[in-house]
Amino acid sequence: MLNKRVATLLIGTILMGSLAVGCGSSDSSNSNKITISGSTSVGPVVEILGEDFEAKNEGVSIEVQQIGSSAGIKNAIDGTSQIGMASRDLKDEEKAAGLKETQIAIDGIAVITNKNNIVKDLTLEQVKDIYTGKITNWKEVGGNDAPIVVVSREDGSGTRDGFQENVGFESEELTKDAQISDGSGNIKSIVEGNENAIGYISFGYVDENVNALTIDGVELNAENVKNDSYAIARPFLFANKEDVITEQGKNFIDFILSEEGQNVVEENGFISVN
């Protein structure tokens, strides 16, 4: 569940389209400035970690732009940002571009429905069949006689990539009837407002306003993600080039991986790498 700090940041993201302390471009002339861009799932907790790091390191400025995993990785490759945030594994060509990856957290992806939906569990195969258009009515999976409104993330989203990889289908197989939206917050809002909708969001965004379905009878929680019994999970990564990142940028990564930093990760609804 989102805590108050992440919820506040999420509202800002929805209203502004991105959340940034500054302008979000790399500036090698200022060794105390850390520029970060990428995943909208990773961004809110990195903002909070950044605030804590700034408070401990006078003069340090951390800029965060939430622009999607693929865009953030591109920025890390071309040096626009010191660090790219990704909510998916790096692709072979991204690794070949010289990026070093650091896993900072683990995230389960929740399959969500409206609070009034009587379906509480789906098999992984049923989720796949819904998203590929083979199952189109809730009565086919034990629900009411109503059409399923499929909601998915935009192309380039790390959450979408992680979801599709774990569920087992490619982008071209996604049903043509799917509604496409950006950001876990927007997906959650759509599902809240439509009794027949199904969507998927980052674990940290789940709250009492939606149903997080069990998958093959397994609940989404930290223990089940860590022991691999919950089927839909992905890493939160930082990606950087060694010749671009500053010493303070490296120090920030060390802070996130410390016990204090990982406690912040867990306090905000995500799963520690420790």
Q: How would you describe each model-predicted region?
A:
Residues 18-22:
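C-terminal motif of bacterial Sec signal peptides marking the signal peptidase cleavage site
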Residues 6, 23-78, 82-274:
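Exported/periplasmic ABC-transporter solute-binding proteins
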Residues 1-10:
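Bacterial N-terminal signal peptides that target proteins for export
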